């Protein structure tokens, strides 16, 4: 059983959680097989494979976590409305998942969000509220809406069901490439890499999980070095 640190508490994600998430996502998301990269293989002297989640439904891996969270809560019978804060990919994932089960969704986006992303989110059935100039301000507004309406907030990464959904990527990688040595994962908020690592390591503890984060926003790298959560 893997333990994932969360503000002094611990998320407990077992392999069965990822398998349950995969069942919920079956026949919903696209099956995207691994693709070999001749260029990167030549550059590194290793066999390099790519998983193009930009070709996923709604254009991002984010739909995995959002759909798993919303479907799990919907099955429990007490989900009537959801709220999320996002500048794009999570917004579309939540909107798509909510509309799939007829649940009202409200997405709070910063005013600087490109109109194309606003329109795409509305196209999946969400009500969009523009608030603030940065994500933190949109997040604060989303929390206000939840407080006022009783809707449930769908966090983009700090949620075990969201992590379980994102971690289904690891199940697919190991299905297609059982003897993979290393998995490189982009790291932003940490939901994707947490899910992938927790899932993959339970199947094969020898797999190395390498997080890659932008130098200009190294919150996870700083947190690992400090042994506690640190901002960028």
For each predicted feature, which ranges?
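PLP-dependent amino-acid enzyme catalytic core
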Residues: 2-232
